[in-house]
Amino acid sequence: MSTETPTIPEGTEPKTAEGDEVIEPRTEVELGYAGASQVVADGGAATVALFGNVHRSEVRGGGKIKDPLRFREALSALHDVVQSDFRYVPKDRTAYLAYTRLKKASAGLDLWEAQRAYVDWLQRNDPLAFALLDPIVSVHPDEIFFEVFSKDEGSYAKLGVDLSALEPDANPIFGTTNIDFSDELFGGIQRLRSYRETRLAVASHAVALTTTGVPEVLEKKVRVPDAWLRGFLQVQSAGTLPRTVFRLAPIDLYNVLRHLRLNADVPTTSAAPGKAKPKRGGRGMRIELVPGEAPRLVLEPWEVVIPTTAGVFTGTKPEVVRIWGRRRLLLLRRLLPFADSIDVHLLGSGLPSFYVLRAGAFTFTLGLSGFTSANWAQAVSFDLLLPRKADSAATERVAAHLAKSWSGSAQAIAKATGLSPAETLEALQVGCQQGKLMFDVARDIYRYRPLTGAPLDSSRFEFRNVRERRAHDLCAQKGVVRIVSENRIHGVGLELTGKIIVAADKREYRPELLIDDEGRVKKAECTCAFFRKHQLKEGPCEHLIALRLFEAREEVKRREQRGKTRGTITMETRTYARRHARGEDVYQLALDQKRLKIRWGLRGQDARVQSLFFNSADDARVAYFERVDDLEKRGFLDASAS
């Protein structure tokens, strides 16, 4: 039985000052290894010896690797994801000034006390240096797979090694554990060669190595921020949502990566005389999907169109999906030459996307969140897609079934547990969010994979902080949150002004948000005391979060009603695009009560604008939908969310 007990260490539990400031809680996880994972050379053979966590249940598996080169490059890509951090790091001297104060304060201490003070300072000021949970490895009846999550909460990766890639050892022990993926192990992996016999060995104690001068068990504790664990669970759980799938050839992705490597994210046009300097160009990638045609990849801001060669899109609905995090695709560069095909799974514009590389018996899944931990506005809207609560009995029943069968499709699990398909799906999604289960995007099945040895307290991962919890409470109360004005400014973004009446405070708050086309907050203001004191330095206040939540929910309702109840719509904006030899025509239709504004022109050029005013909202609505129907008949794609 596992002795691992995730707890909140003393001094790291949530605290409030004046009822508003929150210190980020962390989960302490105890790890112990019977030896350091390494590559052991023995004559003409090499063994990738991975020691599991002794504080978790015994796990054992492995065998002779049939294709060492693909195995080497797949593990190297996994290591690149572990080390990746795409967050912006500004120049500041905070760490240096803190270090000088520490040095002065510890001048009179002996060596041991000084080292302890330095480690304590690192844990307080650089928590990510200690925060990474070691990679997870699971031995299942059909494959051995590894899972990792990046520092910036933006990239998730899973490497699946099918049993056909091995000459498997006898008597495996199925289960999940952690492994220590150190730089020394990575260096040893780089020395694997195709002409040298290579073996994989995963075990807690049974990896036979000769060690001298090291303790019997290597113990370490990591203090993982709950936000990081929450991001891991949510991005992995996103695979359970409805997805649009299409296929790429490896050369298609290579063309994307080549262009990104040769071009920086800078504006492509200079300012005209007498005009202001243009803003930085977009950093997204648009994917144009038309049934019966090959998908097209469009790189912003250069508007470079990369046609794909793996076949036509087999979906039934034409659409344009805009995704972010495209430079994270460079994490696949080492495995790309060995890939046979690439399946792309899209959830929608600005939402997580998954890239499944199939390289023989190896399958590498890269999940991109579409945002980093700093982009709270996009993260909050993503939270609405996953269920908040579910029947705990159904979740336990599903988890108990998978603990025996190890994996299964949603249909097979529903049949085995006697639950309805809807109940099964919700229970599986909640199980993934709680860290008990995981969804294998590559195989479209669910697996039993406890993230930690001891169950995680799911209530601590439901919200990022107390302000987000309060924001959800505000939105749950009818009539408390209202949108006073909603203005979509062409080329700028969405401008929101809200009105929030809090009876407990006997006050009315007026939050304002400007969200650009990439989902980032460009401007935020609120009349509350928390915002006046901290601005956005301590994160958004509960009223800004509530406004963003309310707008996202209203947008979901509008999209669900699109094409069903046109007679009730009084405010809506749609964008349509159609590509031709000269470029791409873009139309934007904005209905606002009695007013209809139309913008059209070639993408990247100044648009023509026409404003129409009507005697009634009904007349404006009729004119709006007449133009919508006309554009769709002419073959324009709905790019409203892109």
Positions of predicted regions on the chain:
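Long, low-complexity, compositionally biased intrinsically disordered regions
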Residues: 2-642
